[in-house]
Amino acid sequence: MRDQHNGKIVNISSIAARRSAPAMGIYGIAKAAIEMLTKVLAQELAPFNIQVNAVAPCMVRTAFSEPFWSNKDLHEAIVKTIPLGRIAEPIDIAHPTLFLCSSGADFITGQILLVDGGASAI
């Protein structure tokens, strides 16, 4: 990317970088570190026309999060924290990520895009 003076890096963070939850401490710390790395790399790589951003989703229906969304009580509790009233599907994260990889995002760098169904608004 440096040699080509062009590139896009999109890291995957999480709402857990901003919102604490029991038993999620290490995960949240790791995601917060990814967000800081995103901002630092954005500054370091900008002279090479490389944009570095991150997408920070809320709960996404994946195998990793299955213990949370497959439990009816936990699922209901999680959905109550998301104004759009559902957990995210992988495609909900894919589209914003693809945008950040496109030429439409050429002037966006060092940003953390919250894709959380409005959860960070409350």
Regions found by a protein language model. Give the residues of each.
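Active-site helix of classical SDR
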Residues: 30, 38
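Active-site "substrate specificity/gating" loop of NAD(P)-dependent dehydrogenases
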Residues: 20-24, 29, 46-47
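Residue(s) in the substrate-gating loop at a strand-loop-helix junction
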Residues: 14
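Conserved catalytic-site region of short-chain dehydrogenase/reductase
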Residues: 17-19, 121
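Short, flexible catalytic-loop segment of classical short-chain dehydrogenase/reductase
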Residues: 18, 52, 56-67
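A short helix-coil junction within the Rossmann-fold of NAD(P)-dependent oxidoreductases
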Residues: 1-8
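C-terminal helical subdomain
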Residues: 36, 54, 76-104, 108, ...
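Alpha-helical segment proximal to the catalytic Tyr-Lys
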Residues: 43-47, 106
